[in-house]
Amino acid sequence: MSERNSAVLELLNEDDVSRTIARIAHQIIEKTALDSKDADRVMLLGIPSGGVPLARRLAEKIEEFSGVSVDTGAVDITLYRDDLRNKPHRALQPTSIPAGGIDNTTVILVDDVLFSGRTIRAALDALRDVGRPNYIQLAVLVDRGHRQLPIRADYVGKNLPTARAEDVSVMLAEIDGRDAVTLTREDSEGDS
């Protein structure tokens, strides 16, 4: 019988995470024409837990680079998940939509990791109950592949091809005390 050991690799450090967020902010400014007077109202809605602080940081960078203030909020997906039987129950998080609602806006959903696409599908269902934006886009810090649904991010900080058994963790200072992206691999003793 073989023993299992975990190897943790740091893929992005604090500086890498900061640069990645800045790059996504520039892409959002360019693609949404935020600095144009004809641009739709844009808001960033984070998916708890990692997407919420990422949305706030993106909004800060967007304002720093373009001078345009972008509303932020959060969309709780707990009741919209299709895997409730398979995962431990999560406490409900508040959904906070900026004043004026999401009708006739460009909503950019923000999450830390895009994996199967099920979290994003749940967020789309939750948004449908809140209003009808003109456009919905997706920004993620890490896209690790392995989609189970036909969902693609509009803004990707880092593409990290992984094995299904590997685990990608995004750590953010607001939640974890530091910024980093790590990959955990399960290795069997004796594997070379």
Swiss-Prot record:
It comes from the Bacteria. GO terms for biological process: regulation of DNA-templated transcription. The keyword Transcription applies. GO terms for molecular function: uracil phosphoribosyltransferase activity. InterPro entries: PRibTrfase_dom, PRTase-like, PyrR, PyrR_bifunctional. Pfam families: Pribosyltran. Gene3D superfamilies: 3.40.50.2020. Keywords: Glycosyltransferase, Transcription, Transcription regulation, Transferase. Its EC number is 2.4.2.9. It is an enzyme of class 2 (transferase). A motif (PRPP-binding) lies at residues 107-119. It catalyses: UMP + diphosphate = 5-phospho-alpha-D-ribose 1-diphosphate + uracil. The keyword Oxidoreductase does not apply. Belongs to the purine/pyrimidine phosphoribosyltransferase family. PyrR subfamily. Regulates the transcription of the pyrimidine nucleotide (pyr) operon in response to exogenous pyrimidines. HAMAP family: PyrR (MF_01219). This is Bifunctional protein PyrR.
